[in-house]
Amino acid sequence: MDVRFPPYIFSMPHLIYNSWLSLNAPKLAQLQLQSIKLVGQDKSINQSELPVNSENISIRVETETNIDSLAKEEKLSEHVHDEKADKIEKTSEDNDTSTLLKLKRRVACDICSKSFCDKGALKIHTSAVHLREMHTCTVTGCGKQFSSRRSRNRHSSNNNPKLHMPESLTLTGSGLSMKTSLDTFWPTRFLLGKDHPLDLSLNLV
């Protein structure tokens, strides 16, 4: 006799199962009969609802799938259309608000009603155009005039002596010589003559 496998160990589960079957056999038979009846009723109901022709069945299935796909596409297109409309409305509102803010920030001139981005640009405009304030160079002997302080300061800060020379002085081969600005700047063919002198001054009224 084998010590590892005691006797009747293999036959015990079989005996337990057989005794359980003998006790519960009538209940199991009733359950099987009920399940068979239910399955038969379901099959008869399904067969009465479905048409006999297989072509009609396939056509119905195809039409249902087509209707479902069309409904899904319509829902998606409506959703995408709504999102696009919302984005367009938001961008238009943002553009409107940004243009309104830009218009509010801009400053208009009281005299000519031109608009400028800030008060500094408006001040430069009024002093240069309407008040005709001219700013002369601070270097002695230069005498050049500018419409804005910025350009005057940029000119004055440059140490190049050629920039600060008077307009009437020109460089010749040997040194400095005095000449009239009309003769040096304009050719003789543009000058009208001594009887009708050309007014080249930029003093606008």
Swiss-Prot record:
The keyword Electron transport does not apply. Residues 145-168 are annotated as: Disordered. GO terms for cellular component: nucleus. It is found in: Nucleus. Expressed in the VA and VB motor neurons and at lower levels in the SABV neuron pair. Its main location: nucleus. InterPro entries: Disconnected-like, Znf_C2H2_sf, Znf_C2H2_type. A zinc finger (C2H2-type) spans 107-130, 135-164. Keywords: Metal-binding, Nucleus, Repeat, Transcription, Transcription regulation, Zinc, Zinc-finger. The keyword Magnesium does not apply. One of its GO terms (molecular function) is zinc ion binding. GO terms for biological process: cell fate specification; negative regulation of transcription by RNA polymerase II. It comes from the Eukaryota. It holds the Pfam family zf-C2H2. Probable transcription factor. Involved in motor neuron fate determination and maintenance, acting as a transcriptional repressor to counteract gene activation by transcription factor unc-3 in a subset of motor neurons. Required throughout development to repress transcription by unc-3, probably acting by binding to specific promoter elements. Represses expression of DA and DB motor neuron-specific effector genes, such as unc-129 and unc-53, in VA and VB motor neurons. This is Basonuclin zinc finger protein homolog.
